Amino acid sequence: MKWVTFISLLLLFSSAYSRGVTRREAHQSEIAHRFNDLGEEHFRGLVLVAFSQYLQQCPFEDHVKLVNEVTEFAKGCVADQSAANCEKSLHELLGDKLCTVASLRDKYGEMADCCEKKEPERNECFLQHKDDNPGFGQLVTPEADAMCTAFHENEQRFLGKYLYEIARRHPYFYAPELLYYAEEYKGVFTECCEAADKAACLTPKVDALREKVLASSAKERLKCASLQKFGERAFKAWSVARLSQKFPKAEFAEISKLVTDLAKIHKECCHGDLLECADDRADLAKYICENQDSISTKLKECCGKPVLEKSHCISEVERDELPADLPPLAVDFVEDKEVCKNYQEAKDVFLGTFLYEYSRRHPEYSVSLLLRLAKEYEATLEKCCATDDPPACYAHVFDEFKPLVEEPHNLVKTNCELFEKLGEYGFQNALLVRYTKKVPQVSTPTLVEVSRSLGKVGSKCCTHPEAERLSCAEDYLSVVLNRLCVLHEKTPVSERVTKCCTESLVNRRPCFSALQVDETYVPKEFSAETFTFHADLCTLPEAEKQIKKQSALVELLKHKPKATEEQLKTVMGDFGSFVDKCCAAEDKEACFAEEGPKLVAAAQAALA
């Protein structure tokens, strides 16, 4: 290995090192500094997001009042940095403002106790009370004309309400990215409110944006969980693999610098430091664009855009081409007689280099798989470097990777075939059965939500070319399973889920895949309520109808976990016919009341 490069790699693991997002000199007034850097519009948006993510139950108007007060205070500090309280940290200033909310105790209960603490404990306390499942339901889009009227009457309020509604539903949303989506939202309404058919223009665009927003939220939640539960090292390893795939022409020293900056930025956003996070993200985009020649040939178009679009574009940019004539991996990591010496002198650096070199050569692998391979390589070196003949011991380490690569390949192949055979709804139901049998203690709404999300892997990834399927599918599954882990952590009910969620971030998906039917589960009593429905079912949107049916399927399995596929098919078929019949009846409610008990009796007989 080239030792000049090796020494430069040490900088990756020195948390103080960073040329782009540097630790700035202390400013007399932090809030004035951030206001000047970000500008009033972005400052206001970020403060609104911060308050909405902490105080998720408060009405929009209350947040607007707080934002106005903080903004006016910041302007005062810009005019005179030595004015009263301008020297306070952002946590102190925003925390003090949160604690002035009169309804804090009534709305948030013990969260009000946080206000008795001093910083930094107070902010940590607020973070612990963020609710990943606040129960507000999906954002309902009002009628197109009403939306356009509201947009034209007060654009700033309209977009502020959008930021508020997303932020309070997603308390870990990546704040600068949410400002970007608000700009996109504005663009949709600017265009569609001038269209002849406003609804025809708005509906598909708003739906497409909603999907992007939900995906963005889930990805950032995984990053925050990675930092919070597994530490900075885990996040940096993930980032090394991802950026090495995306920027394979960049030197490792460059990748290491970007990774260090990214870790700082995401730590700030996950920690509620949204002004610092957005400011540092803008600095990183600036650095990347100034140094694009040494990073990627694909960045030129991104770098001509305004700051929010620029950062988003860089995060989504296509992979660069692999450099020609890369030496075989084995040269530095198997055949070199100094492998153990290099490893033992700087373990994380040596493994970081391995991960970089392996990832840039394998854009078709998922990040999770690359990290599992690095873990296997580390375990092999730990074992072999303690033997009398290390080179002989680790000579075939790359052969040991084969089962680790084949397992997700086979899983994706099998599940894509099942998806192609059953379609998305049928595939979701197959996963629902699979996961309810594995972890029946998990609540029915969570099992339905997670299985529906897992089922979307088919339409998201199985339609991709073969070379892209694995990366797409496994990285998507990591994001969805993190949602299960986050919800389960709040109300833990299954030791199996806790074990898979907490033992290893990179092995979460294989851990869940390997779970068998839980033989220790004591079945629930049969409840007629499971099949008690009313006429309102008929007017529900298709997705909500599916959720009702899928909830019934889960409850059936919790009652009869050993039910065969044939039995389930019979009962769910009867259920479908029952719904169709009553929704077509003249007196729907009477039909549901009369036919419901018959369905219950038939279901009990079928499952007996």
Swiss-Prot record:
Binding site for Ca(2+) 1: E30, E268, D273, E276
Domain of life: Eukaryota
Subunit organization: Interacts with FCGRT; this interaction regulates ALB homeostasis. Interacts with TASOR. In plasma, occurs in a covalently-linked complex with chromophore-bound alpha-1-microglobulin; this interaction does not prevent fatty acid binding to ALB.
TM region(s), chain numbering: none
Residues annotated with Phosphothreonine modification: T444, T446, T570
Pfam families referenced in this protein's UniProt entry, alphabetically: Serum_albumin (PF00273)
Disulfide-bonded cysteines: C77-C86, C99-C115, C114-C125, C148-C193, C192-C201, C224-C270, C269-C277, C289-C303, C302-C313, C340-C385, C384-C393, C416-C462, C461-C472, C485-C501, C500-C511, C538-C583, C582-C591
InterPro entries: ALB/AFP/VDB, Serum_albumin-like, Serum_albumin/AFP/Afamin, Serum_albumin_CS, Serum_albumin_N
Modified residues (N6-succinyllysine): K229, K460, K588
Propeptide stretch(es), residue numbers: 19-24
Protein name: Albumin
GO biological process: cellular response to calcium ion starvation; cellular response to starvation; negative regulation of mitochondrial depolarization
Residues given in the record as Zn(2+) binding sites: H91, H271, D273
